Amino acid sequence: VEKKPFNHLLPGSLALTFGMLGCNFHCDFCQNWVTSQTLRDPAASIGAEYIQRISPEQMVQTAKRNGCNLVVSSYNEPLITSEWAVAIFKQAKAAGLRCAYVSNGHATPEVMEYLAPYLTAYKIDLKTMQANQYRQCGGKLEAVLESIQLAHKIGLWVEVVTLVIPGFNDSTQELWDTSRFITSVSRDIPWHVTAYHSDYKHDAPPTSAKKLQEAAEIGQEAGLKFVYAGNLPGRVGSLEDTHCPNCLKVLVKRRGYYVIENHLKETNACPYCGTVIAGVWQ
């Protein structure tokens, strides 16, 4: 589940992740473009070769057979195939599995209401705080901000990810704007700042560990309790770990997608000082 990434959702659990083809965005820096852009870009046509027919029942059986605790819709943009996702989530929830979305967050209130009965968690990409940058991707900044607010308001566990791209969204001002917005929704929302690599049609240099650390420090200074740096395992110090915001003890130690220690398996409180840690731990 850390690969989604979710750091406060059943750490170390296996998640069966499914997806489809297509996206309502056309980001030139997409890291999943082979599946997300298949329907509009001939260069991504190989994505169609990954498709296989499977029923919701078979999906859930596969998850149970492999010891998964979660079923997650991801890879392309799940919002464009929400009916299909719900067909799977209904079966998964009945079988005792948790369900989650990994999305660009460009959702309407109607689809959020449709998904809410089945979802435990919702990961949303907050790509930039510049409206013109979102328009270049094919979306609207305000729609994404409203989705983050709504997902939190209706009780979904929300984690926000920003892919930090040199020259696109990595200015100090923009990182502050992003941090302050998330803080305005809830200081408990984890913010993942993740490293970009050159892909698809974008050729900026890769994000440095130093830049991720700087971004994380801004998030912490803005008041966020849980800030993580991702995609550079072993190079960002303790920013892969979950710390108690009160006593600062390490509660979940990670390296990349792997959980090394987890002190929240049986409790949602810090075993050292008793502070309740926001998340879905059991």
Give residue spans per PLM region:
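Auxiliary Fe-S-binding modules of radical SAM enzymes
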Residues: 167-168, 172-282
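Short Fe-S-cluster ligation motifs
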Residues: 1-15, 54-74, 274-282
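Short flanking/linker segments adjacent to small metal-binding domains or redox-active Cys/His motifs
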Residues: 4-9, 24-29, 83-86, 90
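Conserved AdoMet/S-adenosylmethionine-binding subsite of the radical SAM
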Residues: 51-211, 218
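Residue-level detector of family-conserved "landmark" positions at structurally sensitive sites
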Residues: 40, 73, 102, 160-161, ...
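N-terminal [4Fe-4S]-dependent radical SAM core
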Residues: 1-20, 33-37, 240-241, 249-257
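Short secondary-structure boundary/capping segments
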Residues: 6-8, 113, 261-262
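Canonical Radical SAM [4Fe-4S] cluster-binding loop centered on the CxxxCxxC motif
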Residues: 15-48, 256, 278-282
